[in-house]
């Protein structure tokens, strides 16, 4: 009896020692992981220690909750909106990177997650029922296999009102059913995506860019709203956070992030020094340079590239807003929403910049941070209906400017 008790004690001591050894090995691996950089090393960790079934169940539960109600219709009644397929958290002074994409352009999220270290929000547009289903499967696969997606990304879905999205069943065979890592998901997405001409959806449904932008920036005190095929400079999120933490004086200021486009997107410049070198040899140029030079000209690129190099991000100079400037910017306070009547191509961003000006915001250009669009914007890369859409939205923009006079009767500013 006494011997049996001693044996049991020895067994439990041995079991406890084994459990402690496993725990120490996991802690050791985590400490080694903290010294590594890049998505590949993080994925290797999650291959050794995959997320618990509970965390995956939570992802599925969130998707089910978001999809169960059938979504809500937007103000026009043309679109069905599913908020919060994925959710993220942020503190009051955080800056969220807000973007929008068609389903095939979600592959750009990988590059954004590498460069932007803070919270990210993406609104996805699915033009067909099949795309809506693919979007939910992608949300499940990305959040199941990509730690950064679970931790930092909010995802919303918009589709035509006549369609409804359904909860994906990961057990069913399909394009993403057998994937095991984050990189595999993005690789598969790159293979099944059908890159097309800008705004050419292949349907009679309009791309609701401003609805998507508003949805992506909902709930954020500070947001940088960009196109999904743009990449921010390295450290931009950290620099903005430090600025906002040190001062609360930016409530009525739009902090302009200069935007460029690069001829070849094989290697995107990480810092201003790399960008300026490419700019000087013509590999990088101002955004929209070949389509609408005045749309970005007030940024004053020649002044910006010649600013002395600094380690801290700060506003470098003030620029009075003028038509048709449509800068990319970070702003807090009561920022006007994007007018959702503007769809497809033309005047969808400038209308919001115009209202920002009339509402009393000032524009200050940041010294170091920047955005780079992948590829030169060329007229031939747009769909045939671009000019007709532009003319339609031009008429709407004239009406919009008249409406601003009634909305801001005491403002001395006009567009």
Curated annotation (Swiss-Prot):
<dbReference type="GO" id="GO:0015020">
    <property type="term" value="F:glucuronosyltransferase activity"/>
</dbReference>
<keyword id="KW-0912">Congenital muscular dystrophy</keyword>
<dbReference type="InterPro" id="IPR043189">
    <property type="entry name" value="B4GAT1"/>
</dbReference>
<dbReference type="GO" id="GO:0018146">
    <property type="term" value="P:keratan sulfate proteoglycan biosynthetic process"/>
</dbReference>
<keyword id="KW-0735">Signal-anchor</keyword>
<dbReference type="GO" id="GO:0070062">
    <property type="term" value="C:extracellular exosome"/>
</dbReference>
<keyword id="KW-0472">Membrane</keyword>
<dbReference type="GO" id="GO:0008532">
    <property type="term" value="F:N-acetyllactosaminide beta-1,3-N-acetylglucosaminyltransferase activity"/>
</dbReference>
<dbReference type="GO" id="GO:0000139">
    <property type="term" value="C:Golgi membrane"/>
</dbReference>
<feature type="binding site">
    <location>
        <position position="227"/>
    </location>
    <ligand>
        <name>Mn(2+)</name>
    </ligand>
</feature>
<keyword id="KW-0225">Disease variant</keyword>
<keyword id="KW-0325">Glycoprotein</keyword>
<keyword id="KW-1215">Dystroglycanopathy</keyword>
<dbReference type="GO" id="GO:0007411">
    <property type="term" value="P:axon guidance"/>
</dbReference>
<keyword id="KW-0451">Lissencephaly</keyword>
<feature type="topological domain" description="Cytoplasmic">
    <location>
        <begin position="1"/>
        <end position="8"/>
    </location>
</feature>
<dbReference type="GO" id="GO:0005794">
    <property type="term" value="C:Golgi apparatus"/>
</dbReference>
<dbReference type="Pfam" id="PF13896">
    <property type="entry name" value="Glyco_transf_49"/>
</dbReference>
<feature type="topological domain" description="Lumenal">
    <location>
        <begin position="37"/>
        <end position="415"/>
    </location>
</feature>
<keyword id="KW-0464">Manganese</keyword>
<keyword id="KW-0808">Transferase</keyword>
<keyword id="KW-0812">Transmembrane</keyword>
<comment type="function">
    <text>Beta-1,4-glucuronyltransferase involved in O-mannosylation of alpha-dystroglycan (DAG1). Transfers a glucuronic acid (GlcA) residue onto a xylose (Xyl) acceptor to produce the glucuronyl-beta-1,4-xylose-beta disaccharide primer, which is further elongated by LARGE1, during synthesis of phosphorylated O-mannosyl glycan. Phosphorylated O-mannosyl glycan is a carbohydrate structure present in alpha-dystroglycan (DAG1), which is required for binding laminin G-like domain-containing extracellular proteins with high affinity.</text>
</comment>
<dbReference type="GO" id="GO:0046872">
    <property type="term" value="F:metal ion binding"/>
</dbReference>
<comment type="similarity">
    <text>Belongs to the glycosyltransferase 49 family.</text>
</comment>
<comment type="pathway">
    <text>Protein modification; protein glycosylation.</text>
</comment>
<feature type="glycosylation site" description="N-linked (GlcNAc...) asparagine">
    <location>
        <position position="300"/>
    </location>
</feature>
<feature type="glycosylation site" description="N-linked (GlcNAc...) asparagine">
    <location>
        <position position="204"/>
    </location>
</feature>
<comment type="subunit">
    <text>Interacts with LARGE1 and LARGE2.</text>
</comment>
<keyword id="KW-0333">Golgi apparatus</keyword>
<keyword id="KW-0328">Glycosyltransferase</keyword>
<feature type="transmembrane region" description="Helical; Signal-anchor for type II membrane protein">
    <location>
        <begin position="9"/>
        <end position="36"/>
    </location>
</feature>
<feature type="binding site">
    <location>
        <position position="229"/>
    </location>
    <ligand>
        <name>Mn(2+)</name>
    </ligand>
</feature>
<keyword id="KW-1133">Transmembrane helix</keyword>
<dbReference type="GO" id="GO:0035269">
    <property type="term" value="P:protein O-linked mannosylation"/>
</dbReference>
<keyword id="KW-0479">Metal-binding</keyword>
<protein>
    <recommendedName>
        <fullName>Beta-1,4-glucuronyltransferase 1</fullName>
        <ecNumber>2.4.1.-</ecNumber>
    </recommendedName>
</protein>
């Amino acid at each position: 009896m006494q011997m049996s008790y001693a044996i049991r004690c020895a067994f439990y001591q041995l079991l406890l020692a084994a459990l402690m050894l496993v725990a120490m090995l996991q802690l050791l691996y985590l400490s080694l992981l903290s010294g590594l950089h890049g998505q590949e090393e993080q994925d290797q960790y999650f291959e050794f220690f995959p997320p618990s079934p509970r965390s995956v169940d939570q992802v599925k539960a969130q998707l089910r909750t978001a999809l169960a109600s059938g979504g809500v219709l937007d103000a026009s009644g043309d679109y069905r909106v599913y908020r919060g397929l994925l959710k993220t958290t942020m503190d009051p002074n955080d800056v969220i990177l807000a973007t929008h994409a068609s389903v095939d352009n979600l592959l750009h999220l990988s590059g954004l997650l590498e460069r932007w270290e803070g919270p990210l929000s993406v609104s996805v547009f699915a033009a067909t029922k099949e795309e809506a289903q693919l979007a939910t499967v992608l949300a499940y696969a990305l959040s199941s296999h990509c730690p950064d997606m679970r931790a930092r990304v909010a995802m919303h879905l918009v589709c035509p009102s006549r369609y409804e999205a359904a909860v994906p069943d990961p057990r069913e065979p399909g394009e993403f059913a057998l994937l095991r890592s984050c990189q595999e998901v993005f690789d598969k997405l790159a293979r099944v995506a059908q890159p097309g001409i800008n705004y050419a959806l292949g349907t009679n449904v309009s791309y609701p860019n401003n609805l998507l932008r508003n949805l992506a920036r909902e709930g954020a005190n500070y947001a940088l709203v960009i196109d999904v095929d743009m990449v921010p400079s390295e450290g931009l999120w950290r620099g903005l956070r430090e600025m906002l933490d040190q001062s609360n004086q930016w409530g009525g200021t739009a902090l302009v992030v200069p935007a460029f486009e690069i001829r070849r997107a094989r290697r995107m410049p990480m810092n201003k020094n790399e960008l300026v070198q490419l700019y000087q040899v013509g590999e990088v140029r101002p955004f929209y340079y070949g389509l609408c030079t005045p749309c970005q000209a007030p940024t004053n690129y020649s002044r910006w590239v010649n600013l002395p190099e600094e380690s801290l991000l700060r506003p470098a100079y003030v620029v009075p807003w003028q038509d048709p400037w449509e800068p990319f910017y970070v702003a807090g306070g009561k920022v006007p929403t994007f007018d959702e009547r503007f769809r497809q191509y033309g005047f969808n961003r400038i209308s919001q910049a115009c209202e920002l000006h009339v509402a009393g915001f000032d524009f200050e250009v940041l010294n170091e941070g920047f955005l780079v669009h992948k590829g030169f914007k060329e007229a031939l890369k747009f769909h045939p209906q671009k000019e007709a859409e532009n003319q339609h939205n031009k008429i709407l923009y004239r009406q919009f400017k008249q409406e601003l006079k009634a909305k801001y009767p005491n403002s001395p500013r006009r567009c």
